[in-house]
Amino acid sequence: MVPQALLFVPLLVFPLCFGKFPIYTIPDKLGPWSPIDIHHLSCPNNLVVEDEGCTNLSGFSYMELKVGYILAIKMNGFTCTGVVTEAENYTNFVGYVTTTFKRKHLRPTPDACRAAYNWKMAGDPRYEESLHNPYPDYSWLRTVKTTKESLVIISPSVADLDPYDRSLHSRVFPSGKCSGVAVSSTYCSTNHDYTIWMPENPRLGKSCDIFTNSRGKRASKGSETCGFVDERGLYKSLKGACKLKLCGVLGLRLMDGTWVAMQTSNETKWCPPDQLVNLHDFRSDEIEHLVVEELVRKREECLDALESIMTTKSVSFRRLSHLRKLVPGFGKAYTIFNKTLMEADAHYKSVRTWNEILPSKGCLRVGGRCHPHVNGVFFNGIILGPDGNVLIPEMQSSLLQQHMELLESSVIPLVHPLADPSTVFKDGDEAEDFVEVHLPDVHNQVSGVDLGLPNWGKYVLLSAGALTALMLIIFLMTCCRRVNRSEPTQHNLRGTGREVSVTPQTWKIISSWESHKSGGETRL
């Protein structure tokens, strides 16, 4: 017989399937009642079970999921967006330069994106330089365009890897899912036409590292394997197991929702699509730890109550409540009818909320209907109160449930800008706002007045300027010649020493201005 301390199936069935310890258990199937003596009372051992007489234990190795899986397998990745920055320079006639920057998108290639990502992660200055605005060229009276291609890497961008079909899930993908990442195709399209998603590690197999090797003991009967004792000493049955692949690895999904990869000779069917593997994380391990502590404490309380019953030779409803099975599965139910101790076989199910078994006043739901009482007595210490309400002793004990609520926490992950469903993309290929924050600022640089003439206007202006300059030169040359001719004549007149003044009326010659001034005036 397998040692009872190693058989632990009921404990694992509940917490791994439901994630929380039940606030209560109640029979969903209840056999006929039969009278018993107090010496037939026993405390249920909620930690043990016996399995089909598999007594042969042998050491073996198996593979199971690591702690932390498989709620979601995170695959780190990055997005790559192609951007073209265009610098347009116009130099006008007077030499002023106007520079205008424009940004558009281009479709990136996976190889170029991988190289840009490696540059960024390695701190290579080539990545930052690739994001700088182009140095514009210029030419007088011409418009010169200079373009520069850049790849904007935004990381991290985390996607969830589905271990069942190895597809990726993220809101950055067009339909929320990408099935194209494989050896031949190492990128996914996104909900932006000029952005692709790529995994950080090009070796995709490393992203599905969710398994660990363990040692245990195989429990068998002849050539048939009934179950095994895992590395932690917990027994797990193979009854009801089905075949299921995770990340391409064939294994068995057990009835409690756990997954193992082990060699068996048993005929096993494939799991239907709705048979998935339960969560195995640190929180579930913590819950199992709390469950074990609670079950051990409850068993001690049950043994104390049983000892009190044997000592006092008397039974109370409150003491009978300690004999209830605390985990789903087969067990016993006890009650007192007409001062007679009664026992019945029962199959217990878990209760998550009290409303499940107390739908209305005076009704205790068992097996889908209100269970009848006998003089206000049900079973397992449950009675009908004077006011007509069903009284359950354990209803006031909610400490463990509070522990479960304390373990719950919410996490706000980093959201990639493309994952925002409210993002409105621009029409055409104009650069989007979400990449602008990763690029240097662009603005119009104006060094002076821009005449804004078309190409033919520039040549007309040039011709008019040349003609004006030629006419100005001719005019200046003409003026200079006239000035040079007048200067010799004036010089000759000053050289005679006397100035002659002619009066047309008298034709009389006045010798000089000095004689006229001294009084030699001749009257007509």
Curated annotation (Swiss-Prot):
Coiled coil: none
Biological processes annotated in GO: entry receptor-mediated virion attachment to host cell; fusion of virus membrane with host endosome membrane
Keyword presence, Membrane: yes
Stretches in topological domain Virion surface: 20-459
Signal peptide: 1-19
Positions of disulphide bridges: 43-302, 54-226, 80-113, 178-188, 208-247, 242-271, 363-370
Function, as annotated: Attaches the virus to host cellular receptor, inducing endocytosis of the virion by using different host proteins including TFRC, GRM2 and ITGB1. In the endosome, the acidic pH induces conformational changes in the glycoprotein trimer, which trigger fusion between virus and cell membrane. There is convincing in vitro evidence that the muscular form of the nicotinic acetylcholine receptor (nAChR), the neuronal cell adhesion molecule (NCAM), and the p75 neurotrophin receptor (p75NTR) bind glycoprotein and thereby facilitate rabies virus entry into cells.
Additional information: Arg-352 is highly involved in rabies virus pathogenicity. Its mutation dramatically attenuates the virus.
Protein name: Glycoprotein
Lineage of origin: Viruses, Riboviria, Orthornavirae, Negarnaviricota, Haploviricotina
Gene: G
